């Protein structure tokens, strides 16, 4: 009797997953060489926060934004001009501003940096759109911009100020909805199928989708923003399809068919997993328990050296 190829594929995949998970227990994963953890103290944490705030203050652009195409290291980053740079700057600025606000530093220079960042956000973020049909880098700008807006709403003292940030936040939700992929969720490239479509048909990625949904959830909790439940449901389903039994998440929708390739194994999912776990948990997935969160936090701390390679070495890939 012949076996259908799909049945064989499923069987091999299940066996591979089971063997891999049996071979690698999280508690037995040793720290990467040279990454032994130092015991944290309140003093060391405070010093680290101040160091980060000091960097953001010094690194802020004169117009209140952060980031810019000035240290590319000659890498092959596909960036259609000028929209790609607008998207990256919006994403970097939103992330930096959100972190600066979370640090709650009351020094005058830190307060001034927040004010400059808020002014830039109010003026420039509404202009953000897709650079062209081949990229949706703007998803990062909408998501991290929305995280900053939620915090600016929390800082606002008057109803007029709060209303201003709510309006801008709702605009960002509505804009990013335009760029949801046909498979649910969001990606950042749409150039591999030789199709140019109004609604992206590229590669939706688990981590981009989680980033956008986390920002939406926070915006709804903080400002009462209205979310499109169809968009939310299809995007959550996209993440679930990219989830493996050990709470690793494959890189993209197409990677579902090679779940144990190196990029999709636990070390490859190091930064993706907690974003996706947090997203699913925020939207009510009860399978993302405290144990799952703690397990992946431990794994992250043990293997953070992998991320440092991509962050600091000349060629991140």
Model-assigned labels for residue ranges:
Residues 8-18:
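Bacterial N-terminal signal peptides
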């Amino acid at each position: 009797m012949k076996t259908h190829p799909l049945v064989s594929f499923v069987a091999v995949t299940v066996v591979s997953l089971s063997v891999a998970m049996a071979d690698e227990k999280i508690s037995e994963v040793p720290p990467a060489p040279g990454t032994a953890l130092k015991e944290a103290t309140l003093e060391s944490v405070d010093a680290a926060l101040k160091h980060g705030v000091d960097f953001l203050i010094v690194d802020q652009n004169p117009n209140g934004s952060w980031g810019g195409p000035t240290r590319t290291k000659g890498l092959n980053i596909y960036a259609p001009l000028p929209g790609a740079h607008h998207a990256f700057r919006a994403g970097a600025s939103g992330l930096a501003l959100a972190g600066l606000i979370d640090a709650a530093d009351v020094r005058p220079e830190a307060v001034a940096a927040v004010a400059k960042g808020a002014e830039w956000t109010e003026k420039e973020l509404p202009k953000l759109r897709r650079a062209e049909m081949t990229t949706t880098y703007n998803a990062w700008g909408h998501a991290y911009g929305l995280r900053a807006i939620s915090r600016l709403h929390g800082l606002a003292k008057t109803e007029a100020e709060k209303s201003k940030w709510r309006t801008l936040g709702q605009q960002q939700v509505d804009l990013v909805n335009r760029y949801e992929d046909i498979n649910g969720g969001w990606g950042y490239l749409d150039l591999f199928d030789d199709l140019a479509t109004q609604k992206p048909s590229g590669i939706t990625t688990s981590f981009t989708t989680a980033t956008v949904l986390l920002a939406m959830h926070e915006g709804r909790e903080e400002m009462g923003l209205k979310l499109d439940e169809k968009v939310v449901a299809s995007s959550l389903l996209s993440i679930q399809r990219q989830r493996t039994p050990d709470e690793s998440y494959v890189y993209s929708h197409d990677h579902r068919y090679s779940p144990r390739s190196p990029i999709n194994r636990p070390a490859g999912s190091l930064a993706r997993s907690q974003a996706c776990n947090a997203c699913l948990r925020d939207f009510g997935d009860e399978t993302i328990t405290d144990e799952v969160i703690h397990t992946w936090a431990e794994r992250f701390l043990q293997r953070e050296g992998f991320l440092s390679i991509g962050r600091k070495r000349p060629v991140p890939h």
